[in-house]
Regions:
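Conserved active-site/ligand-binding neighborhood in enzyme cores
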Residues: 1-258
Length: 258
């Protein structure tokens, strides 16, 4: 969270963690059975403020390792939102191929191009993009990308550091008796907010591709995201599904296995 005390000059960066005190089960929340409330590790009187929704890989990794970060650094290296481009369209009559009067609609899409500088000073040098790992060699080229088939530039780049698995990760998890899982992208689970491999009653299950049995103890997440689209094969809208938003954190307790 990014709270700001009433008399403070800037915002703070505060961790959230499960609360397992004597009053945990009487917190006044309608949490699912067996889950602990997630609270601030520091008691700060103040309301949450806005801040970067997207963090740099380096800041995210440092935060996961328990390092302290300041709001100014995270805000400078992160982003509050992705730029969105709105386009206005007209409906085309199928027989005459002419625009139907009054039939206007808009579409919105992420704008990953170079942003404009203020005061007509040109364009920013850096821009956003999708990072894709491929099993085959891809040459620099132009391609249609996304649901609208936008013309995009495919360019080779160096692998980004920060996603390597630490050699001591397994021993640290075993020593702590649990692990914390953070979603880097939205996820659709068969159990709503619960992955399908977890028992909805006991909140226990075996981690995929392992023999490690865990129990879910707490969850911190934003509102669900709607996922839908247009089915070209059936010529109708796809059924809407609910996805867990990126940034959701799941706390697990180790039960069996190593």
């Amino acid at each position: 969270l990014y709270p700001q005390a009433p008399n403070a000059s800037g915002r703070q960066l505060v961790r959230l963690s499960p609360h397992n005190g004597d009053d945990a089960q009487n917190s006044g929340c309608d949490l699912p059975e067996g889950l602990l409330p997630v609270v601030m590790e520091q008691a700060i009187k103040g309301k949450p403020k806005g801040g970067p929704a997207f963090w740099s890989v380096q800041d995210l990794w440092a935060w996961q390792q328990g390092q302290d970060l300041d709001f100014e650094t995270v805000n400078r290296q992160g982003a509050s939102s992705m730029p969105v481009e709105l386009r206005t369209h007209v409906k085309i009559e199928s027989r005459s191929w002419a625009a139907e009067e009054g039939k206007l609609f808009q579409t919105a899409a992420y704008d990953l191009g170079n942003a404009k500088k203020p005061h007509h000073a040109g364009w920013e040098e850096a821009h956003y993009g999708f990072l894709v790992q491929s099993e085959v060699m891809l040459n620099d080229d132009l391609a249609k990308f996304g649901g609208e088939g936008r013309l995009s530039h495919v360019k080779q780049t160096q692998a980004i550091s920060g996603f390597e698995c630490p050699t001591d990760l397994a021993s640290n998890i075993e020593r702590a008796g649990g692990l914390r899982l953070t979603l880097l992208s939205p996820a659709i689970f068969s159990g709503g907010y619960l992955p399908g491999w977890l028992n909805p009653t006991s909140k226990e299950g075996v981690l995929p591709h392992s023999q490690v049995k865990v129990r879910l103890r707490a969850v911190a997440m934003d509102r669900w995201l709607p996922v839908s689209g247009w089915d070209l094969d059936q010529n109708k809208p796809k059924a809407m599904r609910k996805a867990v938003a990126a940034g959701a954190v799941y706390w697990f307790e180790l039960l069996e296995g190593s």
